[in-house]
């Protein structure tokens, strides 16, 4: 082997071997235990960032470890290729999104190969490939036939100048990103999938998902948002019908002091026709789209409609207001306001001087002032007529019973979850496979006409979707009759909701999935990705899996057995304040820093002009702060194994990882040291086999350390997924190897065993260098095909142990003794120890406390 570690050559050798031997290509082997490891596939944005590298390194380490356990391991990779950024890039570069996307895929695929990830590239898929989305279109038609798809009017961002629909991210400060026009809220017909039909199952199945982080399950529970309450109707004064509301707190019914309706509610529209100020307010609400997440923090505004509702228990008249915090899409678009016992209702009541009544008192003797602050806990009813004195729980039941008996209310279960709107008015997505006949009938495109292909050779004008702008594209026919194709495309979450299943049979052309392959590989054993996908992607994928099950394509009910959500990659930020009040951010690679003794940056200057820059602190790597580190630059400088080792060593996978140049250099030094140790060892020729019966103390110590390391690393990687502590254990082992430097045959034997072990257990983490070192250590097989080492229990048994000797609780000596020494012998040894005798001389020994295997404490006075 070469004396010097040359990452470029070493890594090329390993990659050539894997590619030539198709090492990672797998097929179903029914008799062999399978392991399907999947990292969330990337959007082909142009080049990999460090977040990708961290995610995919974790996945590759787990995959290679499982392979060494003798499992049939599948680790595929593909591209989540549709989406808005491709359209924006195409407009900027005056090219077609397909061309930009495919060129990015080529570049990023090469980067993934350079990092040595063990992917089965024969399974590669891109979601923009018609052979992929044709099956999504086929599946949508099946869902339509099952009644799980419907169309309804839904609100979009409308640019009145460009006459086009804008995505939320194309609305900047309420204006269209290109035209600058004030964006309006407009209702258009859109397609929805009934995820709410599966709400209960999606919620209940979380209970059995032991391999998922509790945090993610909680986020999904909250998103599904199951609640039990009462739906009741307040009659309207001098109006037909009534106001139906849903409440989880019927116990607070006597505290209602106003009603609030959404701007789109029929009652708000009726009031707008009568009062100009109401009409203006309703228009204002309609054009300022509010995301549900913003409701809590935004300013609450409203206006009195002039209508009155009648309280169902007291017959009191209650004013009906239009309020900007009530959404038509949630519940009934109306709510009963109880300002004494709800913070939002309280804030609104204070602002508009509406009555605030107390109807719940604390269970204890606390003093509360309901005018100052809402009391939102449950308690005991007060000022509630015949219900006063009941607990909130008792009143819930009694009031619900009364409303049901009177026919004005009923107990209901409600979900926060809304049906999934899958229509997008964008071009770069999979066309929705629906068509409209001349008589207005809507139906799925017949299977024999799929895929509905997206034309790829297009020009983007930045305004209209090319398929909406081309009147010819949407022309088709059905049974000889003219028909018109839908020009909306699918939400890109559709593609990522089933890609994991298509990887099982990516080239299967007889159906969406090959059931035999799907049921062999699924569910995914380990899924890895960022926690930002906890709700939408992971919930949609769970939903899709149940749909796949219900059309008979898979047997299982959940897609992912274990989920690991890796932490973010952070880096220092540097900037200068500009005259206009903005900031210019500088990349860490362009800045020279000085650090204090603790490694904190204390001064930073820009390399180009030598002038100081401000230190902005450590934050997530991002384009906006320009603090991303290009993985390619680090690979070119130090090699892929160094990047992989740093990523795995710097932090446990779930925690944030702070980028550190010195940490990267430390990882590189460790690999050079490992190379040098193997080189020095192999220069002495072949080592004999270990003869456990003929080892001296130092040789036994190294052998014990080797097998303790195997036990620790196995547990760290398989159960705990703490790769950083596994690497630290190997570093300790190599320190021990360095201490046993003599050339006795059995010293060489235990050293060979230790180095073999280090290379084996590091091979999932730094596979290129280990591929070369394994062969240098004299093995004819490849390390990627080797089995994971097994700890030898007998090697870990200590023949000698160190015992601490104390007098009156203070350490006075340490002795090496046989591991099986008895209590009496230990006591004798302690009392005869020179140092112990020095501290007991002239004193009476009162008692001797022996803790076997640990210490002896002599009590004397």
Swiss-Prot record:
Motif ('HIGH' region): 42-52
The species this protein was found in: Marinobacter nauticus (strain ATCC 700491 / DSM 11845 / VT8) (Marinobacter aquaeolei)
Pfam families listed in its UniProt record: Anticodon_1, tRNA-synt_1, tRNA-synt_1_2, tRNA-synt_1g
Residue sites binding ATP per the record: 623
NCBIfam families: leuS_bact
The UniProt record lists the keyword Translocase: no
Biological processes, Gene Ontology terms: leucyl-tRNA aminoacylation
The enzyme's E.C. designation: 6.1.1.4
Family of the protein in this entry: Belongs to the class-I aminoacyl-tRNA synthetase family.
Main location: cytoplasm
Protein name: Leucine--tRNA ligase
